[in-house]
Design a protein with these regions (language model features):
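Catalytic Walker B motif of ABC-type/P-loop ATPase nucleotide-binding domains
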Residues: 169-172
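The feature captures the beta-strand-to-loop junction immediately N-terminal to the Walker
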Residues: 36-38
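Helix-to-loop junction immediately C-terminal to a conserved catalytic motif
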Residues: 51
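Conserved ABC ATPase "signature" region
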Residues: 67, 110, 114-139
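Helix N-cap at the start of a conserved alpha-helix in ABC-type nucleotide-binding domains
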Residues: 180-182
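Conserved ABC ATPase signature
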Residues: 144-148, 152
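Conserved catalytic motifs of ABC-family nucleotide-binding domains
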Residues: 165
Length: 262
């Protein structure tokens, strides 16, 4: 079943070339989709248009049968409860504890007063504890977020998205600032979330080999337009060159391509 559909979506910033130009694609429930491309290719703009953190300049976006691009404030807030977001730079409140940051994922379901006072019921707290345990950071729940590592912060961000009970999670360069070991941990967790929970993931990445290893599907962007959309097995060296505008093929890419091909 189609969960997300974009039709002719564009985004123009004043005084610049279009960040997105006539972008159209659909995503099925349970898909793991990686969006690759060079810096400035439109990956982050795409993700932020999907949940309307920024407003598209044109086109239509529908999610779960609802036309997101036409929603007003209350309707958009409701839809956003089902679209989690994981940020490159975590977007946590550093002075608050891990568990407090995770429970912020429930704010979309709360009244303004309950949100300000931090009122959460026992079911919400139990769910947060269970997710932290799955992500291997339950022992950090009472630590302030300025006292934990970058990889641990990213797991907090994932936990915050999961307590929303989302149908889809958007991940904006979630491993860009992490070392290889931490990157693998994060990607493994994201893959398990997709396969075990059936949550759709759309993740922007620079690393071609990571996209090849983890994705059901890859979408390649260059200057705001789609230059590739298909399974990892079809992503050829020529396509990589087309997407990035320069030779990007390495031994790790060739090894990953062989793995993706089975």
């Amino acid at each position: 079943m189609t969960l997300l559909e974009l039709k002719n979506v564009s985004k123009c910033y004043t005084g610049t070339k279009p960040a997105l130009s006539d972008v159209s694609f659909s995503v099925k429930e349970g898909e793991f989709v990686s969006v690759i491309g060079a810096s400035g290719s439109g990956k982050t703009t795409l993700l932020r248009c999907i949940n309307r953190m920024i407003e598209p300049s044109g086109g239509e976006i529908s999610f779960n049968g609802i036309m997101v691009s036409k929603l007003r404030k209350s309707g958009l807030r409701k839809v956003r409860t089902k679209i989690g977001m994981v940020f490159q730079h975590h977007n946590l409140v550093e002075r608050l504890t891990v568990i407090e940051n995770v429970l912020h994922g429930r704010l979309g379901y709360k009244s303004t007063l309950a949100g300000v006072l931090g009122i959460y019921n026992s079911r919400e707290k139990k769910q947060a504890y269970e997710i932290l345990e799955i992500l291997g950071i339950l022992d950090l729940m009472h630590k302030r977020c300025d006292q934990i590592s970058g990889g641990q912060k990213q797991r907090v961000g994932i936990a915050r998205a999961l307590v929303q009970n989302p149908k889809m999670i958007l991940c904006d360069e979630p491993i860009a600032s992490l070392d290889p070991g931490s990157s693998k941990i994060i990607m493994d967790y994201l893959k398990n979330i997709c396969s075990d929970r059936g949550i759709t993931l759309i993740i922007s990445l620079h690393q071609v080999n990571v996209a090849l290893n983890y994705s059901h599907r890859i979408i390649g962007f260059n200057k705001g337009t789609i230059h590739f959309d298909g399974p990892p097995s079809r992503l050829s060296p020529g396509r990589i060159t087309e997407i990035y505008g320069a030779e990007q093929i390495t031994e790790s890419y060739e090894h990953s391509l062989a793995e993706a091909a089975g």
